[in-house]
C-alpha cells in the first residue's frame, strides 16, 4: 500500500504542540502530505442564542466575544503548526500531491461529524489517544467510521 495523504484531526484538550509534532513526524516518516484539521463550534450551532439572551445588544456582544475567542484559538494553532513545520523542515502546501508537505485546515462544525466526513478522502488516518483514555466522538469517528487504516499516537512523545 502506497500512502499519499494522511489525515489528522486535532481533538480537544491539552498537549496541542506535542500532538501536532507527533503527527508531522509520522508524516515525515512516510514522506506524504498531511492535512491537519482543527475544528471549532460556531456558538450559533449549539445555542439558540435568541432564547438564551434576550435583547440584541447582549446577543451581539456574546457573538463578538465568541468570535474573538475562536480567532485567538486559530492563531495559536497556526503559530504552533508553523513552528513545528519549520522545526521538521516540512513544506506548507495546500496541494495534496506534494510529498513531505502539510496543510492546516480550520473547520467550523461538530468535530466528530467533520472527522467522519473528511477522513474518507485520505489513505491513512492519524489520531491521538483521548485525554482520559475514554473513547471520544472524534476518536470513534476517526478509527471506526472512516473506513481507513489508522495509526494512534500518544498525546505526549
Predicted regions and their residues:
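Structural beta-alpha unit
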Residues: 41-44, 52, 68, 75, ...
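Small/aliphatic-rich secondary-structure junction motif
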Residues: 1-61, 145, 156-157
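Structured loop/turn residues at secondary-structure junctions
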Residues: 11, 107-110, 130-131
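A short helix->loop->beta-strand "cap" motif at the edges of active sites that frequently abuts
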Residues: 32, 86, 148
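Hydrophobic/aromatic beta-strand patches that form the interior of the parallel beta-sheet core
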Residues: 35-37, 105, 126, 151
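A short acidic, glycine-rich active-site loop
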Residues: 58-75
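Gly/Ser-rich helix-loop-strand patches that form or flank binding pockets
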Residues: 16, 112-157
Amino acid at each position: 500500500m502506497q500512502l499519499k495523504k494522511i489525515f489528522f484531526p486535532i481533538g480537544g484538550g491539552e498537549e496541542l504542540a506535542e500532538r501536532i509534532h507527533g503527527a508531522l513526524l509520522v508524516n515525515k516518516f512516510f514522506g506524504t502530505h498531511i492535512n491537519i484539521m482543527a475544528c471549532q463550534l460556531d456558538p450559533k450551532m449549539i445555542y439558540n442564542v435568541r432564547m438564551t439572551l434576550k435583547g440584541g445588544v447582549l446577543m451581539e456582544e456574546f457573538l463578538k466575544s465568541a468570535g474573538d475567542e475562536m480567532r485567538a484559538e486559530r492563531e495559536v494553532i497556526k503559530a504552533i503548526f508553523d513552528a513545528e513545520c519549520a522545526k521538521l523542515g516540512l513544506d506548507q502546501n495546500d496541494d495534496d500531491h506534494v510529498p513531505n508537505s502539510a496543510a492546516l485546515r480550520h473547520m467550523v462544525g461538530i468535530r466528530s461529524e467533520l472527522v467522519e466526513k473528511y477522513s474518507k478522502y485520505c489513505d491513512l488516518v492519524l489520531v491521538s489517544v483521548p485525554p482520559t483514555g475514554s473513547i471520544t466522538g472524534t476518536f470513534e469517528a476517526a478509527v471506526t467510521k472512516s473506513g481507513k487504516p489508522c495509526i494512534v499516537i500518544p498525546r505526549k512523545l
